[in-house]
Amino acid sequence: MPQPSSALDTPLPARFQQRLQERLTADDIARFDRDGALCIKQLLTPDEVALLRDGIDANLAAPSPRAKVASRPDDPGRFFEDFCNWQDIPQFGRFVRETPLALVAQRLMQSRTVRLYHDHVLVKEPGTRQRTPWHQDQPYYNIDGMQNISMWIPVDPVSRAATLEFVAGSHKGPWLMPRTFMDNQAKWFPEGSLQDLPDVEADRAAFP
């Protein structure tokens, strides 16, 4: 896997500053620090979303050697994943440099600098049965510390039943065992070295 890239040094246009003043408040930043998640609606323009969608189409047409299918052969759909392509797919490179996401990350982390660790494409085709299991992102990465942000950006309408969910405050720890999505294997840490995730689905009221 490529090493994390250097901080993007391209000056951010003034129009991004204006957009963030309208979309990201001090209360939002405090809420993100408390809950570990924040929904920012209409942050991206239709043209920016279209650019990302074009990049995903290019990625599907020519997957990298890191790509994998996270659904079983008998699944009527397909769950496709690929990583670390922003330097190889022009649309991804433009999306990273020409949208306000770096500034959003900087403000939410309350950091002076921002480094891009990787891009991660996930595509579930219609009819896919494979669910994305509950998990923490942090233990999958080769980094420590609290200044780490994942941004989930849907390019198609997503129903409430299929949308991303979070357990508020779970980012504050403890770290829980990361496992492969399809076969539940522990590949990042030795088995038993971290606590396993609780069964969130069995007791949703306990995990708001």
Language-model segments: what does each one mean?
Residues R160-P208:
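Double-stranded beta-helix
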Residues E98-A102, N148, M182:
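A structural signal for well-ordered alpha-helical scaffolds and beta->alpha junctions
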Residues N142-S159:
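Short, conserved beta-strand element in jelly-roll/cupin
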Residues H120, Q136, I153-P157, F166-A168:
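Short, structured patches in soluble enzyme cores that scaffold and shape functional sites
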Residues P2-D35, K41-W134, P139-N142:
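Non-heme Fe(II)-dependent double-stranded beta-helix
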Residues Q42-L44, P126, V155-S159, G169-H171:
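Short loop segments at secondary-structure junctions
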Residues A37-C39, S150-P154, A206:
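Conserved hydrophobic/aromatic beta-strand scaffold that supports enzyme active sites
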